UniProtKB/Swiss-Prot annotation:
Pfam families hit by this protein: HHH_5, RuvA_C, RuvA_N
Domain observations: Has three domains with a flexible linker between the domains II and III and assumes an 'L' shape. Domain III is highly mobile and contacts RuvB.
Lineage: Bacteria, Pseudomonadati, Pseudomonadota, Acidithiobacillia, Acidithiobacillales
CDD domains documented for this protein: UBA_RuvA_C (cd14332)
Subcellular location: Cytoplasm
Record protein name field: Holliday junction branch migration complex subunit RuvA
Native organism: Acidithiobacillus ferrooxidans (strain ATCC 23270 / DSM 14882 / CIP 104768 / NCIMB 8455)
Keyword Lipoprotein recorded: no
Length: 193
């Protein structure tokens, strides 16, 4: 799987981004919010990715942060939510507010997103409330690393742990650890309990 790409921006045509990575051009579909954060054409950029392989297409989605990509992966697990609707969700609300709306059961805020009706909003709340309640994406930079603790929490949530479990597992660890060490040690702590 392609987890990230670093290259030069060839074209920005929302929702499409063309990225040149050592002579190979990649076409990525991104949430509209990502285009506000990225530099101009010709600049270097790192994009976190999700690859979907279907019978009729290979689709590469791009995200400015790991937490945003993890949010996308949670969204597409919900029955009736595909890549387009998940991108619409992330375009309509920042990942942190989307997570908060789901955790609070705020279906009115969710139905304000194009493509999300009342039934879909309810389904999002029911299926994701326990998984999304603690996602807090790191700073929305230019694809750089966010807070390793927040990214580790997002990784644990993606693995199916509840927000309280993930936060508690990370809270007890020493400061200054890298992302991989945080995840490894928190998984060891969680397996003991």
């Amino acid at each position: 799987m392609i987890t990230s790409l670093t290259g030069t921006i060839l074209q920005r045509r929302p929702p499409w981004l063309w990225l040149d990575v050592q002579g190979v051009g990649y076409e990525l579909e991104m949430p509209l919010s990502g285009f506000y954060q990225m530099p101009a054409e010709g600049a270097a950029l790192t994009v976190h990715t999700h690859l979907t392989i279907r019978e009729d297409a290979h689709l590469l989605y791009g995200f400015m942060t790991v937490a945003e990509r993890d949010m996308f992966r949670l969204l597409i697990r919900v029955n009736g939510i595909g890549g387009k609707v998940a991108l619409a969700c992330l375009s309509g609300l920042p990942a942190e507010r989307l997570s908060q709306a789901v955790a609070e059961g705020n279906t009115a805020q969710l139905t304000a997103i194009p493509g999300i009706g009342p039934k879909t909003a309810e389904r999002l709340v029911v299926e994701l409330r326990d998984k999304m309640g603690g996602i807090a994406p790191g700073p929305m930079g230019r694809g750089g690393a966010g807070d390793p603790r927040q990214e580790a929490i997002a990784a644990l949530l993606t693995l199916g742990y509840k927000p309280a479990q993930a936060s508690q597992a990370i809270a007890g660890l020493a400061d200054g650890l890298g992302l991989e060490d945080l995840i490894r040690q928190s998984l060891q702590n969680l397996s003991r309990h």
